[in-house]
A protein has these predicted regions:
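N-terminal amphipathic alpha-helix/helix-capping segment at the start of soluble metabolic enzymes
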Residues: 1-33
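Active-site beta->alpha loop and helix N-cap motifs at the rims of alpha/beta catalytic domains
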Residues: 2-5, 11, 38-94
Length: 94
């Protein structure tokens, strides 16, 4: 487990970091699954997946279900009309 700081500046542990992903590029394949609920995230961690992708709206419950897996928050782009809307949504997801 790697020690990191969350976007809220709180200490946490993660199985992977961005640096790990960059270092493994071309050398290792990772597994990733979509999870949008506490139960799905918990199941993903217990099943041994490396990473989770989630709708940005569901990050809080997904993080409750999986405290340790690398999490990607995805924006649903058809919900944003302009580039400014996309940036606002991206910062809100952080």
């Amino acid at each position: 487990m790697k020690n990191i700081y969350t976007w809220a500046a709180k200490p946490a542990k993660r199985t992977l970091t961005v640096a790990d992903l960059k270092a493994a590029k071309g050398k290792r394949k990772f597994t990733q699954v979509t999870a949008n609920s506490v139960e799905e995230a918990d199941a993903a961690e217990k099943a041994g997946f490396d990473m989770i992708i989630s709708n940005a709206k569901n990050v809080i419950p997904v993080r409750e279900g999986s405290k340790n897996l690398f999490l990607t928050a995805a924006l649903v782009l058809n919900e944003f009309v302009t580039g400014e809307d996309i940036m606002r949504g991206a910062f809100k997801a952080l």
